[in-house]
Amino acid sequence: MGAYDGAEAPRAAPASTAANSRPSRLLLLHSLLLRLVAVVLSILVIAVMVHAKQRVMIFKAEWDNSKAFVALVTISAICLGYSFLQFILSAFHLCSKSWKSPTKCWAWMNFIADQILTYAMLGAAAAAAELAYIAKNGSSRAQWQPICSTFNTFCTRAGASIILSFIAVLALANSSAISAYHLFRRPSSSV
């Protein structure tokens, strides 16, 4: 008979905890960097959008005249606060000598918060992009004239802020993917 004559195959020894924690620490480092990127981009989105103002003769265009731009700044501020808090917590966990994987409850909270903020930022960026499109091209059906030829500085700054917000969405989405990995990679016995 062969090597497997009905007897159970020998079981592999469990991997050491140090070997198991290495990928988690590496992912935590990536998450840390992505959250730092999200913080910086959120600051830039807010700073550039808040300075999107222009006056031409008696007319003026300001970012706070539009609910879509106000929503983008508000959501960016919330993402800034959340990403900064997560950055601090991730840095603490990464530098801690007694580092261990987050609990299942903590992983769920991170995953849900990351998902909510990623989609909120995506929605705010999309609404602002639609408004910018109308400002640039107008709307013949609504009989709205394009304003970017008159308010070029305003439109340029608003557009830059919108581009930065979509880049922030990418950073938040990648952070969210790492949160999902931390949550769903766990075996069911660790619930």
Swiss-Prot record:
Extracellular compartment: which residues?
Answer: 47-68, 136-157
Q: Does the keyword Membrane apply?
A: yes
UniProt keyword annotation of Membrane present: yes
Q: Provide the protein's localization.
A: Cell membrane
Q: Which UniProt keywords apply?
A: Cell membrane, Glycoprotein, Membrane, Transmembrane, Transmembrane helix
Cross-referenced InterPro entries: CASP/CASPL, CASP_dom
Q: What is its main location?
A: membrane
Q: Name one GO cellular component term.
A: plasma membrane
Q: Which residues form a coiled coil?
A: none
Q: Which residues lie on this side of the membrane: Cytoplasmic?
A: 1-25, 90-114, 179-191
Q: How does it sit in the membrane?
A: Multi-pass membrane protein
- The membrane-spanning stretches of this chain are 26-46, 69-89, 115-135, 158-178
Q: Which Pfam families match?
A: CASP_dom
Family assignment from sequence similarity: Belongs to the Casparian strip membrane proteins (CASP) family.
Outline the subunit composition: Homodimer and heterodimers.
Question: Know the name of this protein?
Answer: CASP-like protein 2U4
Q: Which organism is it from?
A: Selaginella moellendorffii
